[in-house]
């Protein structure tokens, strides 16, 4: 069918966050997605898309999707369709009841890694403003917490330090324990473009991922380390950099805590 309007949205299949124009028709519960078109002005994808974001949107109108709120007071009860007003009021009253009985910290919120930044922000706002505590988390923390802690300790923020455009200036790309072509396909495409222009790729992974040898690109080096030896491998690299005086001293002085770097180097 022909779309009636386009709605700008963000793909949540992975962390790239590609911008799309969802071309739809109909209104309310009858809204139907006709097609997903990558946004040419999207900062992350610049008009590109992977097969998941472009075509895997059938769940939005799947016949098994629940379109109306339902309530059951015990696990043995049958589900009962209710209005949105009743569902929201019931949820709010139950949350208040639990807090009144077990204390303010008895309730928290956790978001899916499929949520956008804006959706996660709304959840933490609700938990802090309505529940009155800081019991908020996201399942993305399970994989991101080590990098978040390291970035926060080093740079003062747990966010990434580079944008996707920076890969286009990279001369050497080091991929450790990641599989960009499967996990972040649009970014992987930009990386492959740079590799075809002559950048070198080093893959450190027990697996022989697609980037090790793919059509038109292949890794300069593949280190198939044993599972669980990432820290040992990185420590060995750091040891060589320090002992063979390969560190960029000017960069260290400009970007690092000299005293802490000295203690680390001595270690």
Protein language model regions, located:
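N-terminal export/assembly segments and adjacent metallocofactor-ligating motifs
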Residues: 1-244, 259
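Internal, active-site/partner-interface "lid" segment
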Residues: 245-267
């Amino acid at each position: 069918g022909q779309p009636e309007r386009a709605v700008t949205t963000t793909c949540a299949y992975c962390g790239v966050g590609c911008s799309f124009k969802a071309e739809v028709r109909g209104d309310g519960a009858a809204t139907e997605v006709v097609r997903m078109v990558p946004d040419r002005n999207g900062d992350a994808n610049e008009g590109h898309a992977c097969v998941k974001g472009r075509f895997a949107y059938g769940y939005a109108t799947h016949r098994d999707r629940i379109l109306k709120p339902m309530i059951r007071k015990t696990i043995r009860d049958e589900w009962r369709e209710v209005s949105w007003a009743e569902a929201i009021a019931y949820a709010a009253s139950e949350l208040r009841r639990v807090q009144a009985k077990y204390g303010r910290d008895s309730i928290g919120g956790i978001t899916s890694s499929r949520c956008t930044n804006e959706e996660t922000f709304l959840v933490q706002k609700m938990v802090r403003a309505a529940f009155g505590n800081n019991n908020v988390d996201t399942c993305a923390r399970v994989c991101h917490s080590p990098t978040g802690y390291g970035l926060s300790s080093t740079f003062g923020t747990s966010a990434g330090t580079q944008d996707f455009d920076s890969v286009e200036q990279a001369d050497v790309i080091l991929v450790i324990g990641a599989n960009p072509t499967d996990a972040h396909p649009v970014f992987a495409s930009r990386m492959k473009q740079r590799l075809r222009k002559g950048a070198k790729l080093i893959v450190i992974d027990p697996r022989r991922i697609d980037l090790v040898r793919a059509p038109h690109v292949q890794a300069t080096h593949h280190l198939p380390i044993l599972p669980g030896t990432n820290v040992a491998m990185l420590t060995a690299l750091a040891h060589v950099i320090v002992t063979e005086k390969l560190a960029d001293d000017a960069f260290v002085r400009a970007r690092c805590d000299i005293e802490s770097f000295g203690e680390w180097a001595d270690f």
